Amino acid sequence: MGVNAVHWFRKGLRLHDNPALRECIRGADTVRCVYILDPWFAGSSNVGINRWRFLLQCLEDLDANLRKLNSRLFVIRGQPADVFPRLFKEWSIAKLSIEYDSEPFGKERDAAIKKLASEAGVEVIVRISHTLYDLDKIIELNGGQPPLTYKRFQTLISRMEPLEMPVETITPEVMQKCTTPVSDDHDEKYGVPSLEELGFDTDGLPSAVWPGGETEALTRLERHLERKAWVANFERPRMNANSLLASPTGLSPYLRFGCLSCRLFYFKLTDLYKKVKKNSSPPLSLYGQLLWREFFYTAATNNPRFDKMEGNPICVQIPWDKNPEALAKWAEGRTGFPWIDAIMTQLRQEGWIHHLARHAVACFLTRGDLWISWEEGMKVFEELLLDADWSVNAGSWMWLSCSSFFQQFFHCYCPVGFGRRTDPNGDYIRRYLPVLRGFPAKYIYDPWNAPESVQKAAKCVIGVNYPKPMVNHAEASRLNIERMKQIYQQLSRYRGLGLLATVPSNPNGNGNGGLMSFSPGESISGCSSAGGAQLGTGDGQTVGVQTCALGDSHTGGSGVQQQGYCQASSILRYAHGDNQQSHLMQPGRASLGTGISAGKRPNPEEETQSVGPKVQRQSTN
């Protein structure tokens, strides 16, 4: 009797650099590649039509590539725990291979399947290929906890073994005598479903700006490396209006679904750098966005509450407002701020926005203007973004809302000035908000300031054809910066809580090839700052707020740990008005000083005015 094997695709929807699939094929007589799709999940999950379309296109491309190997993809309806016991028996399976999933939900699911496989006498092969590193080894190297600063993360990976090279693509030679049993009714039983079959209405659905699949991903990778003149000099290009549009060299959705191997991208960049720079060793900054992705994966892997505020040991408990009406206006692009509304319109239509556009709308929703929880924004991105990734999406929203990691809370993106500096003519606004097309560049970012005659000439009266601004940005941002200031003053006065960590500069490209939901550590013009103050370390490095968990080995602390983090235990009072808001934050033994020095006062046209007097130098002892 021959050896029958199954490879279970989840992410990693590719034939190149797929070590689990290669290992599965070795020694097998038959192999079936399966993807398990839960139709109920399709109808009830918080995932929009663009992302589902991208996934189905990935599956269609994978099936087409498997056909070239005289194989097929088996798309099976159901839930893994129900499907596999049947498949093990029906197909007489001897071994099952999977790509390692680092997310808490994925680890729990895979543990259940491994148990079922063991009971059925099925060998399970697991290989790491969705991340560059073994995340557990990074955590082990850090004393059993994930590093909570990017600088610490960089230090740890510099001590790791060199990365393994991508494995050979699956070819007919790799398959050798391994075959795939395919029945005549395969398409009927195991074909890739359509959007209509999943319950989506496709009437009026425009063509995909981002076609899914490994074939497209590899084409884009070559374009990405060829087109980027900046790669030759390894300089970051300046942001401009064209950067805001989807690029044929963008890679982020393909990395998220695993159509493109992060290791292949890493080594292609390395080879190019060495070719241009005559074999000199590339700096870590070359891989900036790949490493930020890895950083958030590491932070999230042992924290099932990573996407929540409550019960999340690394998240500051901030009393966000609950305002469903304001949230809906933001999500639907009806804020009355053209820059924000154009971004949200592009996101809903195309499933992608530039990483700095993500900064702008996230800041506006949370600490900038609306004071609505980052969790709500994260859910909208999860629905609409093609590259929405559980770990990176949640980590980025916590970071940008000043809820965790590092951030200069006194910086606030201006919803008028930031866009105007990026695209002075307003072409981006006209593209996604045609109702404003008739406005001259002078008023297109703040049309409410246009004289009535200009509004009528543009055939768009503010308050009638396009909404008035939903908030007064200057007032809202002042209030919210003050709120954040009070929260962090309370935290910094609390003995035993380390708050500051240096944030290295991060080369992010022009965003079109960006790999992340956000790109932390970037200083952008068009942001306001409170008090004209800049945090500094004295060595020229930027400083942001960092919540250090108890027992974090690089703070010198120690204590009780739970799933790699400390247990939250201390109540902090939020000093705003009546001082009655309670905040839960974990203590740490080490206390870090806060150095603050005066900085340049912002331009009042482009940025919100400073808030109150300059902050004086403080320290906690």
From Swiss-Prot:
Q: Where is this region: Disordered?
A: 581-621
Its keywords, alphabetically, are: Biological rhythms, Chromophore, Cytoplasm, FAD, Flavoprotein, Nucleotide-binding, Nucleus, Photoreceptor protein, Receptor, Repressor, Sensory transduction, Transcription, Transcription regulation
Binding locations of FAD = 252, 289, 355, 387-389
Motif LIR 11 positions after renumbering to this chain: 430-435
Q: Where in the cell is it found?
A: Cytoplasm; Nucleus
- Location of motif LIR 1 in this chain is 50-54
- Where is the motif LIR 10 annotated in this sequence? 411-416
State the span of motif (LIR 6): 285-290
Locate the motif LIR 8: 379-384
Q: Give the record's GO CC terms.
A: cytoplasm; cytosol; nucleus; photoreceptor disc membrane; photoreceptor outer segment membrane
GO BP annotation list: circadian regulation of gene expression; circadian rhythm; entrainment of circadian clock by photoperiod; negative regulation of DNA-templated transcription; negative regulation of gluconeogenesis; positive regulation of protein ubiquitination; response to light stimulus
Query: For the motif LIR 9, what are the positions?
Result: 395-400
Query: Which segment of this protein is annotated as the motif LIR 12?
Result: 486-491
Tissue spec. comment: Expressed in the pineal gland.
Q: Which domain of life is it from?
A: Eukaryota
**Principal subcellular localisation of the protein:** cytoplasm
Per UniProt, the short sequence motif LIR 5 occupies residue numbers 271-276
Question: InterPro entries from the xrefs?
Answer: Crypto/Photolyase_FAD-like_sf (IPR036134), Crypto/Photolyase_N_sf (IPR036155), Cryptochr/Photolyase_FAD-bd (IPR005101), Cryptochrome/DNA_photolyase_1 (IPR002081), DNA_photolyase_N (IPR006050), Rossmann-like_a/b/a_fold (IPR014729)
The UniProt annotation puts motif LIR 13 at: 492-497
Please describe the quaternary structure of this protein: Component of the circadian core oscillator, which includes the CRY proteins, CLOCK or NPAS2, BMAL1 or BMAL2, CSNK1E, and the PER proteins.
Name assigned to this protein: Cryptochrome-1
Species, as recorded? Gallus gallus
Lineage, top ranks: Eukaryota, Metazoa, Chordata, Craniata, Vertebrata
Q: Name the gene that codes for it.
A: CRY1
